[in-house]
Amino acid sequence: MFLPQEFIRRKRDGQPLDRDGMAAFVRGVTDGSVTEGQVAAFAMAVYFNDLSTDERVALTLAQRDSGDVLDWRALDLDGPVIDKHSTGGVGDVVSLMLGPMVAACGGYVPMISGRGLGHTGGTLDKLSAIPGYDVMPATDAFRRTVREVGVAIIGQTARLAPADKRIYAIRDVTATVESVAMITASILSKKLAAGLDGLVMDVKVGSGAFMPTAEKSAELARSIVDVGNGAGMKTTAILTDMNQSLAPCAGNALEVACAIDYLTGKSRPARLHDVTMALSAELLVTGGLARDVGHAREKLQQALDSGAAAERFARMVVALGGPADLLDAPARHLARAVVIVPVPAPASGVVQRVDCRALGLAVVALGGGRTRAEDAIDVSVGLSALAEIGQRVEAGEPLGFVHARDEATAAHAADAIRRGYVLGDTGEAPPTLYQRVD
């Protein structure tokens, strides 16, 4: 007979946990026979005594198996089922370009995304800025879109890794969110439940990153790669910069417009392009669609230049209920804020540092994110034309623009931007890409 308290005692005392015990514990989490207090005790024991790689694999697989696991084999797809996941940041709109780009190169991308968390923007919130787009379609519609278009970006259903949802909710109120072992299992259980052949992980580093230090980001990347591969899914990771907004804008409708401009060739901001191409190329190599990164970049650039990637995005939008002319007339469909004001620089100088987290929180305060799960969001608000680290600005020139629903919230956001920028005599842009982990 399985006794949860004895299982917890083993981890409390630093003893190893086996796969059968982990599976039994997670089954109890799912069916309710393991209490909230026992989950909290287990999470704290893991926080202090950690999990080995084998234990992390066992926890990840048990959470994967707590609900539905998608199987794409019956569709007889002619390419790999692959995806990218980001730890989150500000202005991180990569998914909206990467999915269609990889699909145009022969991959199948069933991207199951989340809503905003804390100061970070969520891919689902961005897509909710597209009128009619169904972020929670029926499973048949999701599978059909992946098969016919090559990419579908949707939200997580309650039937995928339900144990993770309960464990995370308890971790969130018991000061155990920071456990790298449990973060790893949380991320990968959902990706494995999506039935992926391969995953590329984008782990952010910097003032707007989820992890507090570069060392912790590197530790998470290493853990995800080891556990993903240990669970039978080819996994690599890239550490990328989040010391400033990745796109020159942050906010849901603004970022969708940025993604459309990128796909159609109207504008491809350098830092955003670097990260998008690096992750997309890594994904093509992971899926066996390119022999090396150089070959992958050629294929991706061709997909952009030919319009094939933009076409995949347009088809995905239509397949999931959005407007057919979104790429031709985005301004017709994407909400525009009532108040748009510049944020003048208080002095002349070079941007030395940006408090990226503060920018993300400014978007939340404008109404573009949530402070509670049940909050509605305003997709029109956000920040645009943000000055970059290393850029010189003159006194009175804008550090960026605030898009708000009223003058009062605009003024608060403008103050946050001014406080978030540090100007000096010199400043150098940080690298966009730090390290590949395999």
Curated annotation (Swiss-Prot):
- From the UniProt record, list the reaction(s) this protein catalyses: thymidine + phosphate = 2-deoxy-alpha-D-ribose 1-phosphate + thymine
One annotated GO molecular function is: 1,4-alpha-oligoglucan phosphorylase activity
The EC designation for this entry is 2.4.2.4
NCBIfam families under this entry? PRK05820.1, T_phosphoryl, Y_phosphoryl
Query: Which SMART domains does this one have?
Result: PYNP_C
The record describes the protein's role as: The enzymes which catalyze the reversible phosphorolysis of pyrimidine nucleosides are involved in the degradation of these compounds and in their utilization as carbon and energy sources, or in the rescue of pyrimidine bases for nucleotide synthesis.
An example of a Gene Ontology cellular component annotation for this protein is: cytosol
The domain of life for this entry's organism is Bacteria
Gene that this sequence comes from: deoA
Q: Quaternary form?
A: Homodimer.
Q: Which UniProt keywords apply?
A: Glycosyltransferase, Transferase
Question: EC class of this enzyme?
Answer: transferase
Query: GO biological process annotations for this chain's record?
Result: pyrimidine nucleobase metabolic process; thymidine metabolic process
Keyword DNA-binding tagged: no
Pathway stated in the Swiss-Prot or TrEMBL entry: Pyrimidine metabolism; dTMP biosynthesis via salvage pathway; dTMP from thymine: step 1/2
By what name is this protein known? Thymidine phosphorylase
Pfam family membership, one:
Glycos_transf_3
Checking InterPro entries in the record gives: Glycosyl_Trfase_fam3, Glycosyl_Trfase_fam3_N_dom, Glycosyl_Trfase_fam3_N_dom_sf, Nuc_phospho_transferase, PYNP-like_C_sf, PYNP_C, Pyrmidine_PPas_bac/euk, Pyrmidine_PPase_CS
Question: Would the keyword ATP-binding be found if you checked this record's keyword annotation?
Answer: no
Family label: Belongs to the thymidine/pyrimidine-nucleoside phosphorylase family.
